[in-house]
Amino acid sequence: IVGPAVTIYEDVTDEKLPPQHALDAIDESASGSVIVITGNPSLETVAVWGGLMTAGAVANKHEAAVLNGGVRDLAEIRRDYDFPVYAKTVTPGTTLGRFKTISANQPVTIGDVTVNPGDLIVGDIDGVVCVPQAVAAEVLALAQSIDSRELEQAKLIIQSGSLREGLAKYGRI
């Protein structure tokens, strides 16, 4: 996946509120966006994303969801949608009456990574990274170079039958 970040921050509440900024972000963000939701550390105890939010994201042609919290309805998401969801946890619990959306499209922090709105979110089966807009072209060129070199290195390893030969020629494994 590759797309610009749309950020959402949620915090603890006793109010019975829907995640309004998150719903607005899904409906109003440009197609190709990656919805990034984070917030209070206890967000991992509830599902901030599920089947209906996935349906909205698919309808609006978003790229993926990255959640520093929980997801639910995984069987439905996998069965009915070709939509990547990267989540910290899987849990059936709802956010209603526990969390509310505090902000949208403001810088957020996940672990030690700050994600700014518009930063490129890049992911695959191995995980997700955030590429700041200011260095996106440089990072893309470097990634393409590494990918090309590793393809050549893999060919050499297979042809020679030796990891050592691949390391000697390319300097890394």
Question: What does each of the following model-derived ranges do?
Answer:
Residues 1-117, 131-173:
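Feature captures the catalytic cores and cofactor-binding loops of soluble hydro-lyases/lyases
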Residues 121:
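C-terminal binding/interaction regions
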Residues 126-129:
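Channel- or pocket-lining gating/hinge segments that regulate access to a cavity or pore
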